[in-house]
Amino acid sequence: IRSVSDAPIHTIVYSHGHVDHAYGTWALLKDEATMAAGQPAIVAHRKVAERFAYYLRLRGMVARYMNQPPDHLPTSEEDFVWPTVEFDDELRLDIGGETVHLVHHPAETDDQCYVWLPDRQALYSADYYQGFLPNMGNGKRVQRGTDQWVIALREMADLGATAMLPGHGEAIVNSEMIRSELRILADALAHIIDQVVDGLNARLRKDQIVDCLNWPARFADHPTLAVTYVSPQDIARMVLKRWTGWWDDIPSHWSPA
């Protein structure tokens, strides 16, 4: 930041409440110019505060599933820098003469938003786009967004961005590539969701729906849909989790009357 401006930090936006996106704020607040100017506004979706509270309440479980020592995680409310400005669906800000548009859609988390700077045609896509098949199906995590993830991708594809900054990975500065990347990811996720819905309506068991999942070459061979973190089948399981209960459809696993 200091390589481009000496001005104090005016506003900090949390794209979502994950550790790698919201836990480093303390370093920004220690900046001398910012300290002299006063506390910046901390802007986030309303559910970010709920996420922080959840991390405190279930600290041991979170540590286990993140493969982290418990003492590496926050132990009190004072360990977080909490939002001071919250929003629900969307929020427009005017910061230093720049229009900043925040738009919320549940996806990687239920508190995630993307950031659109229309005057610069610049998009911060947060974790909606990750450069590989995204984390919609991690079996160690809580429910991910499904249809809303697809909606967000298609919205972003239609913005006409000439620069896209993902939450992870390299920037893309080609408008046609941005549009293409967002659209094929949306199509891939929608393809999985639609198959799960069709299987449920055909009254198939959950394991049958996953086992029968079709993953065409258009997606399987695409370099930014690589199976790096989760598989298409994992994503199908997360979609099933959204619409069904804990029962796996095997009669002997149902509690006897």
Language model feature labels by segment:
Residues G60, D158-G160, A171-A257:
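Accessory terminal helices/loops
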Residues I1-A41:
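Active-site metal-binding motif and surrounding structural segment of the metallo-beta-lactamase
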Residues V48-L200:
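Metallo-beta-lactamase
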Residues G17-H21, V48-E50, T109, Q130, ...:
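Solvent-exposed loop/turn segments at secondary-structure junctions
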Residues I1, H16, I42, F87, ...:
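Divalent metal-coordination and catalytic microenvironments
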Residues G24-T25, F52-R57, N135-M136, E176-M177:
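Short, solvent-exposed loop/turn and secondary-structure capping segments
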Residues H10-H18, V43-H45, L123-A126, A163-H168:
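Active-site neighborhood of phospho(di)ester-bond hydrolases with catalytic His/Asp-centered motifs
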